[in-house]
């Protein structure tokens, strides 16, 4: 009597499932980030987070290339991706904010709680994307927001305003940029995002002992990425061919 029905697994299925494993590896990188943040090694935490985001950036194109959805229809890459995104974009940055005590007590705790709850609700919104691939409402990219606050060594007041304003904007019909998928001003948007990323990595290499010109650059590029979606929403003809 056979309890298991063994079959030869096609190479296409092995290849497709390996992409899911790649995506899931982001959870382990996030765990390493949690360990680092718990020990107040925030520079190390952001390096682990950066690696997780690199995985997040490459797994989608690879999945489409090898047709994961068609080969493994019973495994939801979208669900897996959302789980990893919530951990890396929301939970880990919120924990870092709390551990750092950036906003003081008890407000760092309150802010972290507001971040994780509002973001969980946002992930359930089926209409979070517009027809032009803007995000409707603040798209819970708390990894970028909290990282920027660390880079500029924000004061309690500044950090509080940024965090609680972003929580409120999560639920308002204001457009936010997806730097890759939005076509309007795409070359400029990608260029600004690249500059922000390079400056951020430089700040990490300096262990957040950030010179003024880097702070100015991070703030300027970060503000652009934060508000350009709303500007394009107000001026619907701007950036159209």
UniProtKB/Swiss-Prot annotation:
Signal peptide: none annotated. Changing residue 59 to A/E/N: Loss of enzyme activity. It holds the Pfam family CDP-OH_P_transf. The keyword Ribosomal protein does not apply. Keywords: Cell inner membrane, Cell membrane, Lipid biosynthesis, Lipid metabolism, Manganese, Membrane, Phospholipid biosynthesis, Phospholipid metabolism, Transferase, Transmembrane, Transmembrane helix. Its EC number is 2.7.8.24. It comes from the Bacteria. GO terms for cellular component: plasma membrane. Changing residue 85 to A/E/N: Loss of enzyme activity. Its cofactor is Mn(2+). Changing residue 20 to L: 32% of wild-type enzyme activity. GO terms for biological process: phospholipid biosynthetic process. InterPro entries: CDP-OH_P_trans, CDP-OH_PTrfase_TM_dom, PcS. Residues 1-15, 63-76, 122-133, 178-187, 233-241 are cytoplasmic. It catalyses: a CDP-1,2-diacyl-sn-glycerol + choline = a 1,2-diacyl-sn-glycero-3-phosphocholine + CMP + H(+). Changing residue 81 to E/N: Strongly reduced enzyme activity. Coiled coil: none annotated. The chain crosses the membrane at residues 16-36, 42-62, 77-97, 101-121, 134-154, 157-177, 188-208, 212-232. One of its GO terms (molecular function) is phosphatidylcholine synthase activity. Condenses choline with CDP-diglyceride to produce phosphatidylcholine and CMP. Belongs to the CDP-alcohol phosphatidyltransferase class-I family. This is Phosphatidylcholine synthase. It comes from Rhizobium meliloti (strain 1021) (Ensifer meliloti). The lineage of its organism: Bacteria, Pseudomonadati, Pseudomonadota, Alphaproteobacteria, Hyphomicrobiales.
């Amino acid at each position: 009597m056979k309890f298991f029905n063994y079959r030869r697994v096609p190479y296409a299925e092995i290849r497709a499932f390996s992409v899911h494993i790649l995506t899931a590896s982001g959870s382990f990188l996030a765990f390493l980030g949690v360990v680092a943040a718990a020990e107040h090694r925030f520079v190390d935490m952001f390096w682990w987070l950066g690696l997780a985001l690199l995985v997040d950036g490459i797994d989608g194109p690879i999945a489409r290339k090898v047709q994961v959805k068609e080969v493994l229809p019973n495994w939801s890459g979208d669900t897996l991706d959302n789980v990893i995104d919530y951990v890396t974009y929301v939970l880990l940055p919120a924990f870092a904010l709390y551990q750092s005590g950036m906003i003081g007590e008890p407000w760092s705790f309150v802010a972290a709680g507001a971040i994780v709850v509002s973001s969980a609700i946002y992930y359930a919104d089926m209409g979070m994307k517009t027809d032009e691939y803007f995000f409707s409402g603040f798209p819970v990219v708390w990894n970028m927001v909290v990282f920027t606050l660390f880079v500029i060594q924000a004061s309690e007041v500044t950090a509080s305003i940024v965090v609680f304003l972003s929580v409120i904007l999560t639920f308002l019909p204001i457009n936010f940029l997806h730097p890759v998928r939005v076509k309007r001003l795409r070359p400029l948007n990608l260029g600004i995002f690249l500059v922000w990323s390079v400056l951020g990595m430089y700040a990490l290499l300096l262990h957040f002992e950030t010179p003024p010109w880097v702070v100015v650059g991070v703030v300027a590029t970060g503000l652009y990425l934060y508000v350009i979606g709303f500007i394009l929403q107000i001026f619907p003809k701007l950036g159209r061919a």
